[in-house]
Regions:
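Cell-wall polysaccharide-cleaving catalytic domain and substrate-binding groove, primarily
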Residues: 1-143
């Protein structure tokens, strides 16, 4: 998809800019061509698969690691080594409609969708996906 002026997360169907690991995601493109084109980040076959992976990661943060607030979640998602984490936290908390230290329930599809959308906007400099794409990814993650 697109040219290099298109944000990387959009080109890769990876709205959260999730790093590739040794374990492939459902819907991830592990073809030689995809890996040659993108060495660091996951490339997904569809944007829905990218939103599913983003939401699954956030759910893991809450369920496995006990991260309950936007501040805790974004602190892990976007550590200060590469990011202005404080600004990221404030932007996402505002978009979700909570304070940075307020507990959020990611088993609620509306809250999870708002958080995933806010991260996608921040990572890509805008929102490039419609609400149906986000909702489909969130629904898959919550199954």
């Amino acid at each position: 998809m697109g040219t290099t002026s298109t944000p990387r997360g959009v080109r890769n169907n990876n709205p959260g800019n999730i790093d590739r690991t040794s374990t492939p995601w459902q819907g991830e493109d592990r073809s030689v061509a995809a890996i040659a084109r993108e060495q660091r980040f996951c490339v997904f076959l569809t944007p829905q698969a990218g939103f599913r992976a983003l939401a699954k990661t956030l759910l893991t943060y809450q369920r496995k690691h006990g991260l309950r607030t936007v501040k805790e979640i974004i602190g892990r998602w976007a550590p200060p080594v590469e990011n202005d984490t404080g600004a990221y936290v404030r932007q996402v908390a505002t978009a979700v409609g909570v304070s940075p230290s307020e507990v959020v329930r990611l088993d609620n599809p509306v809250t999870l969708g708002r958080l995933a959308t806010a991260i996608a906007k921040h990572e890509n400099g805008g929102m490039y996906w419609n609400a149906d794409v986000v909702a489909a990814g969130i629904a898959e993650a919550l199954k």
